[in-house]
Amino acid sequence: SGSIRLKHIPRPSMKVCVFGDQHHLDEAAAGNIPAMSADDLKKLNKQKKLIKKLAKSYDAFIASESLIKQIPRILGPGLNKAGKFPSVVTHGESLQSKSDEIRATVKFQMKK
């Protein structure tokens, strides 16, 4: 299995959600990108049904580097099982370019 980044965006309607600190939440609000803070994630309280619902409602996730280590602790293995563990975004990168990069990346799996 692997992933390839394409020049064009094959899935422009792909839904991306941001798990961010305050800086990224503000940037997401300005760019009209759905976002959740650490407190919003803690409200899910490791309830498997809610985490599965969250994983199903978005195609991909982006997380602030300050939050990335806490995500397995807060959410448990739910996102990993769905194959949607978040990509890291730093304060230097713009959320819009990162979400476009994710939209342009195609995952594939080889069969024997």
From Swiss-Prot:
Q: Name one Pfam family in it.
A: Ribosomal_L1
GO CC, any one term: ribosome
Keyword Ribonucleoprotein carried by entry: yes
Q: Which domain of life is it from?
A: Eukaryota
InterPro entries, alphabetically? Answer: eL8/uL1-like (IPR050257), Ribosomal_uL1-like (IPR023674), Ribosomal_uL1/biogenesis (IPR028364), Ribosomal_uL1_3-a/b-sand (IPR016095), Ribosomal_uL1_CS (IPR023673)
Any one GO MF annotation of this record: RNA binding
Name the UniProt key words of this record, in alphabetical order. Ribonucleoprotein, Ribosomal protein
Q: Does the keyword Nucleotide-binding apply?
A: no
By its UniProt entry, which PANTHER family does this protein fall under?
Answer: RIBOSOMAL PROTEIN L7AE FAMILY MEMBER (PTHR23105)
Concerning its family, UniProt says: Belongs to the universal ribosomal protein uL1 family.
Q: This protein is called what?
A: Large ribosomal subunit protein uL1
Query: Native species of this protein?
Result: Caenorhabditis remanei
Gene that encodes the chain: rpl-10a
